[in-house]
Amino acid sequence: MVKLRLKRCGRKQQAIYRIVAIDVRSRREGRDLRKVGFYDPIKNQTCLNVPAILYFLEKGAQPTRTVYDILRKAEFFKDKERTLS
């Protein structure tokens, strides 16, 4: 199963996160299938590759709670109301 989740990058005390599609059995820093964006909580910046995210969601990838919140804040789910289990 594939998940969209955060992968930590950056320096100590200055973390930035890549949003990646990754196999659920992989470590947080493990090899990802594809990078689909990044999130910088310090500068509050987000960059999303929308076609890639749509591709993985259509194939059945599940976003983690944090990635779902980032996508919702970026108004990725405009009309669709989605619940996570």
From Swiss-Prot:
The molecular function terms in GO held by this entry are: structural constituent of ribosome
Per the UniProt record, the source organism is Saccharum officinarum
Q: Which UniProt keywords apply?
A: Chloroplast, Plastid, Ribonucleoprotein, Ribosomal protein
Family annotation (HAMAP family): Ribosomal_bS16 (MF_00385)
Naming one, the record's GO cellular component terms include: small ribosomal subunit
Q: Report the locations given in the UniProt record.
A: Plastid, Chloroplast
Pfam family, any one: Ribosomal_S16
**Protein name as annotated:** Small ribosomal subunit protein bS16c
